[in-house]
Amino acid sequence: MNHLPMPTFGPLAGVRVVFSGIEIAGPFAGQMFAEWGAEVIWIENVAWADTIRVQPNYPQLSRRNLHALSLNIFKDEGREAFLKLMETTDIFIEASKGPAFARRGITDEVLWEHNPKLVIAHLSGFGQYGTEEYTNLPAYNTIAQAFSGYLIQNGDVDQPMPAFPYTADYFSGMTATTAALAALHKVRETGKGESIDIAMYEVMLRMGQYFMMDYFNGGEICPRMTKGKDPYYAGCGLYKCADGYIVMELVGITQINECFKDIGLAHILGTPEVPEGTQLIHRVECPYGPLVEEKLDAWLATHTIADVQARFAELNIACAKVLTIPELEGNPQYVARESITQWQTMDGRTCKGPNIMPKFKNNPGKIWRGMPSHGMDTAAILKNIGYSEADIKELVGKGLAKVED
């Protein structure tokens, strides 16, 4: 296979990934592949571009490093072109409502007829099978959170609240990335393709697993947080200092002993309620839980964030300031690791945003291109799989493909 023009870099150099999906979840998987060196082709509708393009800045991050193909993959010669593209593809990711591709005649078996080694990742809200009541429903971030039991665990005691921004989309997209890579590893061993069924609600069910296990195995429902504090453990969660907020985790024998001395609770150490060797203070089961919170709140309220961080560093208590977005760029850790970076958009503007993660030492990722315009690479991609100028012109004339104006 001849690859499209792009630099060679990253651990996935030489891998061809194609994705069909809009907004966040499916495309986030494609974004990860593209930043790790894969050749990633983004399929868009001919008549209507991906709705993410209406956003002013986010698409420049989420669609960087991609090749843009505008093709009607379900109709006539457009379908033929898509299936021909699959012959040279390692991983195909589609995000839609349930078995939408199968309903339109593009089943796993059809794809494997054209490429027996193809890894296929289906990403949907409720999965490829189940009850019709659910499998054909649309789903977004909040839908997946609500249906999975994740949303009900978040928020405050007075009201549940979804986790933002778009947590279920990103978790589901990353699940598609890792699952597809696992499948590709096996395919290269066996020569046999794989199909992956990723249901967003199941991803969030797994992400919300921690406290659920107490219910499934004992009937205990974990309460939601109170003002950002851990529902079970005192000294864990969000706290207010004299000049802003911190998060902390008061965990460990030495940490509890020394912290209690600072906040005036040394006298309860070694009691039956806080015996020697205590590593966590349960805010409900320990009678002193409310007192610990009261004393800690009072002590933190009289100290600045800098003072608290310095003291907690001495005591080896995990703690961090809650940074505002404007504070990120100037933070020395961000600067040292170049966590925020800049790149050029296709129209020559400078865009700033999160850098590639994680950081590969020997085969680092790279930003080599901004977001392509609608249909920008259609001609190049079709030529790459054997189409002539005349063939492409015919597809465009029939409304089955769009090339850049």
Curated annotation (Swiss-Prot):
GO terms for molecular function: L-carnitine CoA-transferase activity. Keywords: Cytoplasm, Transferase. GO terms for biological process: carnitine metabolic process. Its EC number is 2.8.3.21. It holds the Pfam family CoA_transf_3. It is found in: Cytoplasm. InterPro entries: CoA-transferase_III (IPR050509), CoA-Trfase_CaiB (IPR023452), CoA-Trfase_fam_III (IPR003673), CoA-Trfase_III_dom3_sf (IPR044855), CoA-Trfase_III_dom_1_sf (IPR023606). CoA binds at K97, R104. The keyword Transmembrane does not apply. The active site is at D169. Homodimer. NCBIfam families: PRK03525.1. Belongs to the CoA-transferase III family. CaiB subfamily. Catalyzes the reversible transfer of the CoA moiety from gamma-butyrobetainyl-CoA to L-carnitine to generate L-carnitinyl-CoA and gamma-butyrobetaine. Is also able to catalyze the reversible transfer of the CoA moiety from gamma-butyrobetainyl-CoA or L-carnitinyl-CoA to crotonobetaine to generate crotonobetainyl-CoA. This is L-carnitine CoA-transferase. It comes from Salmonella typhimurium (strain LT2 / SGSC1412 / ATCC 700720).
